[in-house]
Amino acid sequence: GVLMDVGHGLHNLSFDVARKVLDQGLHPDSVSTDGHRGNRAGPVYDLPTTMAKLMALGFSLNQVIEMATANAAKLLGRSAEMGSLRVGHPAEISVLKIEDREWKAIDSQKGTIPAHQAITPVFAVRDNTIYEPLAAARP
């Protein structure tokens, strides 16, 4: 079968195209970003913002978390060591804040759709180290 990833980058996410694909019953298996210095101030911002954009397109919070964790690990062939929390395995944890607020989600072509929830990174934990989020502009 075909596996599909939403890899939001500077030039490759269109809400118009996404709606057409979703209307035909095709749904992404995972979500990722091409996050770098050139798109952290928009349109990509970060993975939590991209996840919130998918929520604005109709996906649930649980669906986008699964796309960003377990499904992404499976697509990389690494589900044995990442993508879930299990006893005896290393834990990499992102703590996210879900905010009920109105904002405009922006795609790579400057198209917008209304969004009703935002996902904000609070901190991450890896190898017993806490990491604060990078200071970045957010929509």
Each model region followed by its residue ranges:
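C-terminal cap of metal-dependent C-N hydrolases
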Residues: 90-138
